[in-house]
Amino acid sequence: MRILFAGIIARYPLGGVTWCSLMYLLGLRSLGHEVFYVEDTGECIYDPEQNTRSLDPAYGLAYIDHALRPYGLGDSWSFVNYDGTYHGRSREDVAAFARSADLFINLSGGTWFWRDEYASIPRRAFIDSDPAFTQLSIAKNEDWYVKFFRGFTHLFTFGANIGTPASPVPTGDFVWHKTWQPVVTSLWHTDAPPRRDRYTSVMSWTIESFTDVGGNKDIEFLRFIDLPARTGPRFELAVNGPERLLQENGWATVPAMQVSRTPGGYRDFIQSSRGEFGVAKHTYVATRSGWFSDRTECYLAAGRPAIVQDTGWTSHLPSDAGLLAFSSIDEAADAIERVDADYARHARAASDIADAHFEAGRVLSSLVERASMGGRHFADSASERGERAAEGQWTVQRTPATAASEESEGKPSGMR
């Protein structure tokens, strides 16, 4: 199968974002598919060297090439700048690939355009990595946004509960199918013991996108800010948030860009960690979306236990060893104690969970099979539309943030 894949590697040229697209490309190729990467967001790239948006795409172009070329994909990409100019492969090359493509996959808004070459591909799948936020934005009924999603033949989401009675998020006429971020586990496995005796995370304190429909991680994190007082200084965060506030409460911090500047640096930070302690965005939690982090999957694949906030994902994944859920500060402290009491067992279980649930071959075989079927992504019955959600008129409960910050996780302000 020939697959045109749209991602956001240059738009957000940072380690964690890069791995998301890269593992789709590598996973699909390992299944025997021919892949081509395109990026066509209509927006300026973020340039970490200048710490700002840039009209000059040079940094992003070099970054894409450095990310893809080591894996044999150096001649299989095209970047469309905000001004419509093509870099890497030409528009003619993209159109030629698309003419014989079987499937178009758009991850996280790798393009917001329906150019003829994209629209002509028989199967067109969108991968929603921001569940609840995406559906709540669609529910605002902005014409261009609704029409954009109607252009796909299949819609997938990292929110395992979206469109089910477990979550009140309105889905309207759209049908969303559950999927996970694929992980090429062989690229994350390590036999080396962790160099840090701390649980870590790479996190965004706040983001600017979707501020009118949801709440961010700062709201949730404040509920757990006293955790080090119970467990001791066990945590290290890569965050560009309120570092003084965090440090005063026992959280060690490192510059987010130091960790996220490259895919290699991001992976090294995860592999060197004892495990992950992860808090979710408020909207993921409040809507019981079932969202599960691509970053957490990488910790697990590295054999690093993960202690992460429950968003409803516990209905779909194991949560007793290697991967532990919490909803309260007491549960978080207990989870730390449990992992510390038998670290080797939890580390083995972490790897097993990654292999069983997130291995790229497994995830992508299922996705491609479903995307190749006739199917439909428009609901035609009240039960499918989840009228319970529409009638509930879901609104996000927000509290004032105590501090503003730039993004971390290597994502500049405006990251979805």
Residue map of PLM features:
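Catalytic binding pocket for nucleotide-activated donors in carbohydrate/polymer assembly enzymes
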Residues: 7-10, 15-18, 22, 29-44, ...
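P-loop/Walker A phosphate-binding loop and immediately adjacent motor/lid segment at beta-alpha junctions
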Residues: 116-129, 171-190, 302-304
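Conserved catalytic-core segment of nucleotide-activated headgroup transferases in glycan assembly
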Residues: 163-275, 281-286
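Residues that mark the start of a beta-strand
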Residues: 1-3, 123, 198-200
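Short, polar loop motifs at secondary-structure junctions
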Residues: 108-113, 159-162, 239-245, 309-313
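Extended catalytic core of nucleotide-activated donor transferases of GT-like folds
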Residues: 4-31, 36-157, 161-166, 260-265, ...
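Hydrophobic anchor at the start of a short beta-strand
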Residues: 33-36, 124, 199, 233-235, ...
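C-terminal alpha-helical cap of glycosyltransferases
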Residues: 360-401, 406-411, 415-416
